[in-house]
């Protein structure tokens, strides 16, 4: 048997073995475990959400004398702030459901420290003088209002035994930004050294761990550089410390949600990302602390900080970044290596969404525009591939003539290319250009909150999730659920069919081995990409259809 044929068969067998092996031994077991964990998590979480809501309500009404709370109410948020310790530990995102089920509760971001999903933020003061009593975790603040809303800020006050007065004004906008202004009035006869601090503390929940294609965990902009540490990184290192630095923001990022501290820009801060195992629970904390500031007797000091706690909407982070000069705030969204392409791709999709009201249709429009921009390149590629095919007999003759002299062989072939004005890599250019576009669209679909639960038409209810149908139960007609590696839906099949048709219309590769391998690519991609976000498959299928139309035009007029 010809060695080339043997190599071809070996390559195909190896490729299919890798695909099926990966699906069966890695993806399938992990998906099964994940499905089991998520089933348990969802069923228990519904109970927890109700219990926690009742618990919060009971605290507010029945135990007001012990743990008083200020209710938070805006079009985007609901929850409360504990007056004891001035802790932001009860926050629900009203506009986002946990899943697509009809009775799904809204997403809860912050939860009190004594709950299973503890997650909270604090802003406060410390002093290096032990004789000075400052507000702490046991301090119960006095408030002039029971409700915090965008229209109605809340003013808090507390006076220590030396007559030093502490004032806090909290405002919230219509989205997810809290502004906390602390004022210290030193009515004593002694100097008062203070340091401003902020912290976000979270109990780690393993079920929330995601794959490694996006960042989740401690993050921030320190000295105008983005700092990202995964949960595992911090767990291994125990801490990451940044000495006195310019801290624009630090926080903890999830796939779609962000909690962050934005300190006053008038000072430098020391920042820390920490891990600790307390009472059997893994806890992660990000915090900042300012240098010592001394308040003279009879003087006062005001410090303004902000807390962002909500959804990572692109336009919202952009707005905050511009309005408050928060460097790299949009990088809380993990746009990846192709940021310079990914974000404009999102802007384009979001722009057309404003007109058509459907991100799936927006993907189709953006794909048409990309195709038009690349038409000239595709036309040149076609001509180059055609010339290469015409030169193949001469290339074969040169190979036979200089088979034992590799240097002369390459020299003669390059001379032939130059004489014929052929660029051997020109045929690959459209594919090379499309690679960053492909990954950019994938990133947009995978990490942006705007794509979460965004429907298309028919059975597609979430562009960021895989096609829920499969040919192996006739797209739901047969009453059984195939294993995960057989979840090959209608859109993956359409992608493979259109890819095959486009190959049939394109010039065949000059190298027969490469040509044979390419014939199997639609089948390989069918299995490989069936678990990808369906929005990506819609893009690829539509791109193939446009390529078929484009190829017909090129074939006809060339």
Curated annotation (Swiss-Prot):
- Do you know which InterPro entries this protein is assigned to? Membr_insert_YidC, Membr_insert_YidC_N, YidC/ALB3/OXA1/COX18, YidC/Oxa/ALB_C, YidC_ALB_C, YidC_periplasmic_sf
Function, in words: Required for the insertion and/or proper folding and/or complex formation of integral membrane proteins into the membrane. Involved in integration of membrane proteins that insert both dependently and independently of the Sec translocase complex, as well as at least some lipoproteins. Aids folding of multispanning membrane proteins.
Q: Which organism is it from?
A: Rickettsia typhi (strain ATCC VR-144 / Wilmington)
Q: Which key words are in the record? A: Cell inner membrane, Cell membrane, Chaperone, Membrane, Protein transport, Transmembrane, Transmembrane helix, Transport
Give the family per the record: Belongs to the OXA1/ALB3/YidC family. Type 1 subfamily.
What name is this protein filed under?
Membrane protein insertase YidC
Superkingdom per UniProt: Bacteria
Subunit composition and interactions: Interacts with the Sec translocase complex via SecD. Specifically interacts with transmembrane segments of nascent integral membrane proteins during membrane integration.
Quick one: a GO biological-process term for this protein? protein transport
Q: Per its record, what are the GO molecular function terms?
A: membrane insertase activity
């Amino acid at each position: 048997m010809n060695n080339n044929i043997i190599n071809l068969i070996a390559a195909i067998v190896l490729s299919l073995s890798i695909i099926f092996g990966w699906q069966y031994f890695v993806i399938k077991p992990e998906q099964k475990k994940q499905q089991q964990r998520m089933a348990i998590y969802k069923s228990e979480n519904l109970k927890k959400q109700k219990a926690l809501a009742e618990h919060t309500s009971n605290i507010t009404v029945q135990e007001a004398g012990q743990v008083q709370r200020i209710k938070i109410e805006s079009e985007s948020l609901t929850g409360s702030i504990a007056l004891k310790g001035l802790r932001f530990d009860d926050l629900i995102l009203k506009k986002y459901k946990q899943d697509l089920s009809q009775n799904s509760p809204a997403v809860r971001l912050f939860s009190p420290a004594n709950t299973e999903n503890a997650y909270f933020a604090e802003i406060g003061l410390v002093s290096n003088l032990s004789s000075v009593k400052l507000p702490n975790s046991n301090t119960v603040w006095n408030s002039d209002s029971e409700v915090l809303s965008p229209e109605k800020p809340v003013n808090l006050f507390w006076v220590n035994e030396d007559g030093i007065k502490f004032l806090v004004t909290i405002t919230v906008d219509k989205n997810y930004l809290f502004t906390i202004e602390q004022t210290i009035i030193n009515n004593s006869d002694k100097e008062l050294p203070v340091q401003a601090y902020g912290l976000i503390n979270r109990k780690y929940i393993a079920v929330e761990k995601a794959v490694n294609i996006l960042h989740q965990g401690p993050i921030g902009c320190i000295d105008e550089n983005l700092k990202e540490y995964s949960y595992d990184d911090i767990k291994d290192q125990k801490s990451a410390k940044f000495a006195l630095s310019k801290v624009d923001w630090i926080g903890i990022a999830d796939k779609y949600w962000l909690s962050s501290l934005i300190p006053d820009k008038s000072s430098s801060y020391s920042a820390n990302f920490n891990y600790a195992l307390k009472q059997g629970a893994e806890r992660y904390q990000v915090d900042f602390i300012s240098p010592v500031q001394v308040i003279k007797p009879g003087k006062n000091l005001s410090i303004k900080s902000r807390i962002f706690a909500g959804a990572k909407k692109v336009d919202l982070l952009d707005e905050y970044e511009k309005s408050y000069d928060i460097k790299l705030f949009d990088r809380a969204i993990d746009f990846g290596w192709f940021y310079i392409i990914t974000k404009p791709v999102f802007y384009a999709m979001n722009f057309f969404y404003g007109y058509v009201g459907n991100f799936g249709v927006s993907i189709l429009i953006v794909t048409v525009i990309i195709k038009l921009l690349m038409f000239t390149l595709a036309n040149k590629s076609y001509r180059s591939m055609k010339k290469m095919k015409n030169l193949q007999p001469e290339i074969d003759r040169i190979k036979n003539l200089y088979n034992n002299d590799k240097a002369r062989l390459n020299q003669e072939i390059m001379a032939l290319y130059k004489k014929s004005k052929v660029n051997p890599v020109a045929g690959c250019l459209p594919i090379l250009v499309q690679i960053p576009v492909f990954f950019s669209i994938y990133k947009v679909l995978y990490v942006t909150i705007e794509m979460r639960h965004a429907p298309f038409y028919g059975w597609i209810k979430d562009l960021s999730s895989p096609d829920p149908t499969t040919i192996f139960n006739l797209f739901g007609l047969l009453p059984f659920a195939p294993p995960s590696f057989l979840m090959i839906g209608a859109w993956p099949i359409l992608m493979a069919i259109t890819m095959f048709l486009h190959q049939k219309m394109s010039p065949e590769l000059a190298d027969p081995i490469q040509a044979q391998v390419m014939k199997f690519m639609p089948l390989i991609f069918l299995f490989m990409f069936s678990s990808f976000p369906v929005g990506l498959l819609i893009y690829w299928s539509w791109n193939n259809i446009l390529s078929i139309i484009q190829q017909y035009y090129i074939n006809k007029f060339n």
